[in-house]
């Protein structure tokens, strides 16, 4: 599946299908990006005993109907209010159930359903306004609304938020995804402009997010020690010239070894990288669905 090729070949394509394609492509591209420190990639399963690349790919594909339905619901409803928030919440829970059926109970993309689901809905609400900041701001307005049907959470992320006093995925969304919009995307663009290949530019974007994110996945697995190792190590790679430089590559290998030793996997940063890739592509492809509006 390649959303950009699909849009180029079929001008006037259905908006919901295009946005779902983009979201799934972003998840698969994030999973396949290598070498990511302590994360599932083409080399192996990172710090995860229960995950592998094929499972991540299958999980991403299973979420296509969820993203399509979220986009369709937002386009039909046409405004941000409690009713839309409730519909999106239920669609997200349905998508999570489909994911868990596909993975036989393994949580591969729960955080990504939240982040990308909000961004897909936000893009569908105003499909001619596709700049990253605009889409993230609309997503933040949706996230600020409570979903009365949502269960009171006792997930790893919720427990980490309470224990360490960090914001987590919910606050990141309510603040309009600042680590993606203000850190990940600018680094992606800087690395491209500096001559880095696309894979290295994406790695640098991931590292920029890791350098500033209070990643609840890392905190859950390795506490404050793990978080400091992630943030300091990511900054060291970028300061050494990024993943495209020899010195940066050496630092990246050191970071990978350190996080693996701590069993610390930056899953929250990975979700935000997928959000970056989705937002990065929106302006370039939005003309493909103009004829369907």
From Swiss-Prot:
GO MF annotations in UniProt: ATP binding; triphosphoribosyl-dephospho-CoA synthase activity
Superkingdom, taxonomy of origin: Bacteria
Q: Which organism is it from?
A: Pseudomonas aeruginosa (strain ATCC 15692 / DSM 22644 / CIP 104116 / JCM 14847 / LMG 12228 / 1C / PRS 101 / PAO1)
Supply the InterPro entries for this chain. Answer: CitG, TriPribosyl-deP-CoA_syn
Specify the enzyme's EC class, one word.
Answer: transferase
Q: Which GO terms describe its biological process?
A: prosthetic group biosynthetic process
- What is the protein name for this chain? Probable 2-(5''-triphosphoribosyl)-3'-dephosphocoenzyme-A synthase
What is this enzyme's EC?
2.4.2.52
Family membership, please give it: Belongs to the CitG/MdcB family.
Q: Which PANTHER family match?
A: 2-(5''-TRIPHOSPHORIBOSYL)-3'-DEPHOSPHOCOENZYME-A SYNTHASE, TRIPHOSPHORIBOSYL-DEPHOSPHO-COA SYNTHASE
Q: What gene codes for this chain?
A: mdcB
| Function comment | Involved in the formation of 2-(5''-phosphoribosyl)-3'-dephosphocoenzyme-A, the prosthetic group of the acyl-carrier protein of the malonate decarboxylase.
Keywords, A to Z, come to:
ATP-binding, Nucleotide-binding, Transferase
Q: Which HAMAP family match?
A: MdcB
Question: What NCBIfam families has UniProt attached to this entry?
Answer: malonate_mdcB (TIGR03132), PRK01237.1 (NF002315)
Q: Which reaction does it catalyse?
A: 3'-dephospho-CoA + ATP = 2'-(5''-triphospho-alpha-D-ribosyl)-3'-dephospho-CoA + adenine
């Amino acid at each position: 599946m390649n959303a950009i090729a699909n849009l180029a070949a079929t001008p006037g394509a259905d908006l919901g299908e295009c946005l779902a394609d983009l979201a799934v492509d972003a998840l698969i591209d994030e999973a396949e990006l290598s070498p990511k420190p302590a994360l599932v990639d083409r080399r192996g399963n990172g710090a995860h005993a229960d995950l592998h690349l094929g499972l991540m790919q299958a999980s991403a594909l299973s979420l296509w109907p969820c993203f399509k339905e979220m986009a369709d619901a937002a386009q039909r409803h046409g405004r941000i209010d409690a009713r839309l928030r409730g519909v999106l919440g239920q669609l997200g829970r349905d998508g999570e159930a489909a994911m868990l059926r596909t993975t036989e109970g393994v949580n591969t993309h729960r955080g990504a359903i939240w982040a990308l689901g909000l961004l897909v809905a936000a893009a569908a609400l105003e499909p001619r306004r596709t700049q990253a900041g605009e889409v993230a701001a609309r997503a933040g307005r949706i996230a600020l609304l409570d979903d009365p049907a949502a269960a009171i959470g006792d997930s790893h992320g919720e427990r980490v938020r309470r224990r360490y006093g960090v914001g987590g995925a919910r606050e990141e969304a309510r603040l309009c995804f600042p680590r993606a919009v203000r850190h990940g995307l600018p680094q992606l663009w800087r690395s491209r402009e500096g001559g880095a290949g696309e894979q290295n530019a994406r790695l640098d974007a991931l590292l920029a997010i890791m350098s500033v994110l209070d990643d609840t996945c890392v905190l859950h697995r390795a506490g404050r020690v793990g978080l400091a190792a992630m943030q300091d190590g990511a900054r060291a790679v970028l300061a050494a010239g990024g993943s495209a430089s020899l010195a940066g590559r050496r630092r990246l290998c050191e970071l990978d070894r350190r996080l693996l030793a701590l069993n610390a996997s930056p899953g929250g940063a990975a979700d935000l990288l997928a959000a970056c890739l989705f937002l990065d592509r929106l302006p370039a492809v939005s003309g493909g669905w103009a004829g369907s509006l």
